[in-house]
UniProtKB/Swiss-Prot annotation:
<dbReference type="GO" id="GO:0045727">
    <property type="term" value="P:positive regulation of translation"/>
</dbReference>
<dbReference type="GO" id="GO:0005886">
    <property type="term" value="C:plasma membrane"/>
</dbReference>
<keyword id="KW-0378">Hydrolase</keyword>
<keyword id="KW-0547">Nucleotide-binding</keyword>
<dbReference type="InterPro" id="IPR027417">
    <property type="entry name" value="P-loop_NTPase"/>
</dbReference>
<keyword id="KW-1003">Cell membrane</keyword>
<dbReference type="InterPro" id="IPR000795">
    <property type="entry name" value="T_Tr_GTP-bd_dom"/>
</dbReference>
<feature type="binding site">
    <location>
        <begin position="130"/>
        <end position="133"/>
    </location>
    <ligand>
        <name>GTP</name>
    </ligand>
</feature>
<dbReference type="InterPro" id="IPR013842">
    <property type="entry name" value="LepA_CTD"/>
</dbReference>
<keyword id="KW-0648">Protein biosynthesis</keyword>
<dbReference type="GO" id="GO:0005525">
    <property type="term" value="F:GTP binding"/>
</dbReference>
<dbReference type="InterPro" id="IPR005225">
    <property type="entry name" value="Small_GTP-bd"/>
</dbReference>
<dbReference type="GO" id="GO:0003924">
    <property type="term" value="F:GTPase activity"/>
</dbReference>
<keyword id="KW-0997">Cell inner membrane</keyword>
<feature type="binding site">
    <location>
        <begin position="14"/>
        <end position="19"/>
    </location>
    <ligand>
        <name>GTP</name>
    </ligand>
</feature>
<dbReference type="InterPro" id="IPR000640">
    <property type="entry name" value="EFG_V-like"/>
</dbReference>
<feature type="domain" description="tr-type G">
    <location>
        <begin position="2"/>
        <end position="183"/>
    </location>
</feature>
């Protein structure tokens, strides 16, 4: 028990977290050097391609020091803001964390966010300065930054290079010396926290747990508190990225996989507590927050017959990613689909990509929206995620929208660009701090709606990619918001409705109809494209009809004959216009996302 160390690695994207994990694994000899691949911990293809960690992974390592064998459980965490939920989950099951900072880049916005999660969990934090082999490395400057921003003492910070392997041995020994062993339970009944669960085609739903009290053996009957169900333990394993290692017992402080042979991962949902059926723990393990979706979008199969396939795919994906929520919805324009809730934009992209890749679906995603709180004139307040659910204008007292607290770290030369960008996004500055003479930390309150579309891309281009950005939800505030509807040939297209601030409605509406005019195919009759708020049309464009020469057959002859044919054509067009349907191409729905 005293020889167990549970720790995770905190870092901003690209600061070398997965490489450092690989280095520690190979130093401990857990994975054969022939099998060792770059980024052993990142098992998904998307993770390797994008160079990001999405799912938290774990590995059990052994290390010999001064004649004693130590067990190190390394719990990998994602660095990206959308997956901070995975981070808080991983950190809840550790006693310590390595704070990895790139020696040339310095502290970034997401590093700060994750450190605060670690400090809230009272973890022992070891600062690690990585990439000291780079010519641009300035370890001393980075140590000063950590002390200035986070307030951690860096006198004993460890300098390593995960690429060349310098300092890795010293790092492992520091982990053993500094990170405390798990606290022993006072002979309490078995109690463990599920901090990850996923689906295996052979074994069913697997629960990755951290044991807090007692022990569990193969064949024991266990009780899952959240679902109020009993199951028999079929197998126990220690996690390893290549293949799990079987064991007969999991004891206090250990991290392991429990196999219960379940068909459904919702039976072992993340954050739940597993205890023994006979000798139950009295209360569940607390301090665990469920993920709350922030961004909602409609996902529709391009082939409408594939609706059930999409449902199956989402069910299976939820097994691995407990943070998505979804419910069926229908759209007059797109047919049947789902309203899916995501943690953020990167999460939305990754989920859509995984659905298309792993399940072979072709999907249309509508414009992402956030949850609004609408207080009606009768005093009733409702939450809406879809603009088409908004009550009629005369029934709305006011609308509240979610705000986020954003932290941005940027080189000072781009400060002007960033302030301009944020002012255009209705942001309010709350703090500005010069970390060094060349780097600035900014804090802003921004409406969530302003960052869900393309804020991250715009920020990167305003700062040539040097700024880092992180956000956390803060509160709901009353906003001056209206619903902008788009009508094509007199019919409102529900999938194109968006909620916008009133002062931006005119310009958005104009841009909208202009873009749509280019995309709607020409018909045999005129098509009006209108942007409206309630019944008031604020912008309009017309797609001209295709000409058809009805008088071509008349050679010479009387003018009245031609006039008669032209009149007849005019009548026909009028009738067509009244009943004509216009089909919108896929690009029309995506164009919404591109309008600034």
């Amino acid at each position: 028990m005293n020889n167990i160390r549970n720790f995770s690695i905190i870092a901003h994207i690209d600061h070398g977290k997965s490489t450092l994990a690989d280095r520690i694994i190979s130093e401990c000899g857990a994975v054969d050097s022939r099998v060792m691949s770059a980024q052993v911990m990142d098992t998904m293809d998307i993770e390797k391609e994008r160079g990001i960690t999405i799912k938290a992974q774990s590995v059990r390592l052994t290390y010999k020091l001064e004649g004693q064998i130590y067990i190190l459980n390394l719990i990998d965490t994602p660095g990206h803001v959308d997956f901070s939920y995975e981070v808080s989950r991983s950190l809840a099951s550790c006693e310590g964390a390595l704070l990895v900072v790139d020696a040339s880049q310095g502290v970034e916005a997401q590093t700060i966010a994750n450190v605060y999660i670690a400090l809230e969990n009272n973890l022992e934090i070891i600062p690690v300065i990585n990439k000291i082999d780079l010519p641009a490395a300035e370890p001393q400057r980075v140590k000063n930054e950590i002390e200035h921003i986070i307030g951690l003492d860096c006198s004993e910070a460890i300098e390593v290079s995960a690429k060349t392997g310098v300092g890795i041995k010293e790092l492992i020994e520091t982990i053993i010396r500094k990170i405390p062993p798990p606290k022993p339970g006072e002979n309490n009944p078995f109690k463990s926290l599920i901090y990850d669960s996923w689906f295996d085609n052979y074994l069913g739903a697997l629960a990755l747990v951290r044991v807090y009290d007692g022990a569990v053996k193969k064949g024991d009957e266990v009780y899952v508190m959240g679902t109020d169900k009993k199951h028999t333990v079929l197998d126990l394993m220690y996690p390893n990225p290549i293949a799990p290692i079987k064991t007969n017992e999991l004891k206090t402080g250990e991290v392991g996989i429990i196999v219960l042979g379940l068909k459904n991962v919702s039976d072992v949902s993340v954050g739940d507590t597993i205890t023994l059926a006979k000798n139950r723990a009295l209360e569940a393990i607390g301090g665990f927050e469920k993920a709350k979706p922030f961004v909602f979008a409609g996902l529709y199969p391009i082939d409408t017959d594939k609706f059930e396939d999409l449902r199956d795919a989402l069910d299976k994906l939820k097994l691995n990613d407990s943070s998505i929520s979804y419910e069926p919805e229908t759209s007059a324009a797109l047919g049947f689909g789902f309203r899916v809730g995501f943690l953020g934009l990167l999460h939305m992209e990754v989920v859509k990509e995984r659905l298309e890749r792993e399940f072979g679906l072709d999907l249309i995603a509508t414009a992402p929206t956030v949850t609004y709180e609408v207080v009606q004139t009768d005093g009733v307040s409702v939450e809406i995620q879809n603009p088409s659910e908004l009550p009629p204008v005369n029934k709305i007292e006011f609308i509240k929208e979610p705000y986020v607290k954003a932290t941005i770290i940027t080189p000072s030369e781009f400060l002007g660009n960033i302030i301009t960008l944020l002012n255009n996004r209705r942001a309010v500055q709350t703090k500005m701090d010069y970390i060094t003479t060349t780097r600035v930390l900014l804090e802003y309150d921004i409406p969530m709606n302003e960052i869900v579309m393309d804020f991250y891309d715009k920020l990167k281009s305003a700062t040539k990619g040097y700024a880092s950005f992180d956000y956390e939800p803060s509160d709901y505030r009353v906003g001056d918001l209206v619903k902008l509807d788009i009508k094509v040939a007199g019919e409102a297209v529900d999938a194109l409705s968006i909620i916008v601030p009133e002062e931006k409605a005119m310009s958005k509406g104009r841009d909208f109809v202009k873009t749509m005019k280019e995309l709607v195919p020409r018909q045999l009759f005129e098509v009006a494209i209108q942007a409206s708020i309630g019944n008031k049309v604020i912008a309009r464009e017309t797609v001209k009809s295709m000409g058809k020469n009805v008088t071509a057959k008349c050679y010479g002859g009387d003018i009245t004959r031609k006039r008669k044919l032209l009149e007849k054509q005019k009548e026909g067009k009028k009738r067509m216009k009244a009943i004509g349907k216009v089909t919108l191409p896929q690009e029309a729905f995506l164009s919404v996302l591109k309008i600034d």
